[in-house]
Amino acid sequence: MNKQSWLLNLSLLKTHPAFRAVFLARFISIVSLGLLGVAVPVQIQMMTHSTWQVGLSVTLTGGAMFVGLMVGGVLADRYERKKVILLARGTCGIGFIGLCLNALLPEPSLLAIYLLGLWDGFFASLGVTALLAATPALVGRENLMQAGAITMLTVRLGSVISPMIGGLLLATGGVAWNYGLAAAGTFITLLPLLSLPALPPPPQPREHPLKSLLAGFRFLLASPLVGGIALLGGLLTMASAVRVLYPALADNWQMSAAQIGFLYAAIPLGAAIGALTSGKLAHSARPGLLMLLSTLGSFLAIGLFGLMPMWILGVVCLALFGWLSAVSSLLQYTMLQTQTPEAMLGRINGLWTAQNVTGDAIGAALLGGLGAMMTPVASASASGFGLLIIGVLLLLVLVELRHFRQTPPQVTASDS
């Protein structure tokens, strides 16, 4: 592939066997988690007929994920990362087996579903942090942009496929099949992950885990560059919560049930296009400025989304948001990995991923509050333009990020 091409270069999957193993394991894992994501709310709704109970399970799992990201960040900086990844995946699979056995009971236990949701949320996120911290060692820091784009495509593809498979399984075999196949898929991911090389953490003094986590917070707050990246990531995730307004906006546009699906597909489609056309991003001399501008553009797209007179134009705005947010997210990921010291990678990746989880929840809550006081159109526009104003202020304040320059990585013959 020509080094000037906009298209994503997939050569890492050929030249880096360890990354290829991670790619395969991640795809299987995403499909497995997707089967779980369909089954849990359906089972709870069937048992309780309560949307509140369904929401409670999501909240509990999200809380466990947040704690798991914090703990996983500390563990990834203290212990051999391959062992942490394998332990987390295996333990997570045990929880899926528990859900399967519970579903096979004549009267499944609701409490067991909640407790196993906590178990799986914690251990799943614990492994994610260790894997993120290990990625620079697996592909080299010069290939992080390419690895991030391939990973983004994996996530998007798996997120599209798994709900469809999960729905078919629910229609034919019930939730136990979803849980059983999710468990099988999780244990299958251990096979490629076993081929990974040893991933020891960098040498550093031993300290109390809480003190170690606080050191990560202090680094994040003290670094204008890394802290600014994390802040932008949180705001971008808040903007993506606009999906909670889709049903109300669909009524406003008088959309059919089939047409509503286009709203939900638009952002993932835009993000996939962003990942596929990210070939030149790694060669940007000023990635910080590009990150800021793409983030501002994504906020503008959300602000305009609700104002569109036709739903098809709203879909275009959402796809544009998906594309711009993908560009910003890839730059965030790459700069975070390259500008964070090796000894801090686990904790900073954990904090960065955690702000994605909390940013989405905060954004959904704020939009829900706005929706109670304003029309859906006004709520969507207010959120987008409000974030745009904050983004412009950050463009002025984050001077170090705005002026950051990097030397574009050298492209070898194998990459061309």
UniProtKB/Swiss-Prot annotation:
What is the role of the protein in this entry? Component of an export pathway for enterobactin. Overexpression reduces intracellular arabinose concentrations.
Q: Where in the cell is it found?
A: Cell inner membrane
GO terms of biological process kind = DNA damage response; enterobactin transport; response to antibiotic
**Mind telling me which Gene3D superfamilies this protein's record contains?**
MFS general substrate transporter like domains
Carries keyword Coiled coil? no
- Give TM segment ranges: 22-42, 56-76, 84-104, 110-130, 157-177, 179-199, 219-239, 257-277, 288-307, 314-336, 357-377, 379-399
The organism of origin for this protein: Escherichia coli (strain K12)
Instruction: Give the Cytoplasmic membrane side ranges.
Output: 1-21, 77-83, 131-156, 200-218, 278-287, 337-356, 400-416
InterPro entries assigned to the protein according to its UniProt record, in alphabetical order:
Enterobactin_exp_EntS, MFS_dom, MFS_trans_sf, TM_effector
Its recorded name reads Enterobactin exporter EntS
**What gene name is given for the protein in this entry?**
entS
